[in-house]
Amino acid sequence: MAIRIFAILFSTFVFGTFAHAQEGMRERSDWRKFFSEFQAKGTIVVADERQTDRVILVFDQVRSEKRYSPASTFKIPHTLFALDAGAARDEFQVFRWDGIKRSFAAHNQDQDLRSAMRNSTVWIYELFAKEIGEDKARRYLKQIDYGNADPSTSNGDYWIDGNLAIAAQEQIAFLRKLYHNELPFRVEHQRLVKDLMIVEAGRNWILRAKTGWEGRIGWWVGWVEWPTGPVFFALNIDTPNRMDDLFKREAIVRAILRSIEALPPNPAVNSDAAR
């Protein structure tokens, strides 16, 4: 009898919690117009925490649960890994350019963590990955519950060409932990990474974000901080026209955030087109 009562109570708790979570998620099919305006196919998840009750808004919920390569959005957790493992000391450490000419001119010079994040300097993170190693990277990924937590690769960087994959919904969960300093890393390291993520700011708001692109899929993830609370976002879109499609990531997100007053009208658009 006791077992049966426990089972009933457990089922009630689990399904009640699930139902409550679902009640907080709203499909915004009307946001299709923002994707159509730029002839883009994709998904966006917005978690608005400016009120007491968090509201999760999503366009294309099915796609928002599908995992893709994180590309350079992975620089957010990867920087935490590097700091924790000692591959990077702080934001002032200079990493000397190896002299190899790469396709992005901004990559062909000495770097620090701030420039590496801003310019999506891949070779810096390749150095970090080599020093950290696959086994330790896997442990880190599992500790932060990041996507499929698989850093294996047969060719290329595991966060671009390898097996690591994450869904837009999972990006939001990770970003929330970072915002609240709830990741298993030193608080000062989490604060530093958030500082590196700043894209722009106004009198009473701050936009922190990171782009990503692996050739077929483009990302923009981050959040806007307001005095009343943060608004998290994670967008991914198909990029059949490759670099010609990259501006659409920020354009769509900004239009959607402005539509719910999570960004001021027509703020300056950052032109980051790195992957």
Curated annotation (Swiss-Prot):
It catalyses: a beta-lactam + H2O = a substituted beta-amino acid. Its EC number is 3.5.2.6. It is an enzyme of class 3 (hydrolase). The modification N6-carboxylysine is found at residue 75. Substrate binds at residues 210-212. GO terms for biological process: antibiotic catabolic process; response to antibiotic. The active site is at 72 (acyl-ester intermediate). Pfam families: Transpeptidase (PF00905). It comes from the Bacteria. Residues 1-21 form the signal peptide. Keywords: Antibiotic resistance, Hydrolase, Plasmid, Signal. One of its GO terms (molecular function) is beta-lactamase activity. NCBIfam families: bla_class_D_main, blaOXA-2_like. This is an oxacillin-hydrolyzing beta-lactamase. Belongs to the class-D beta-lactamase family. This is Beta-lactamase OXA-3.
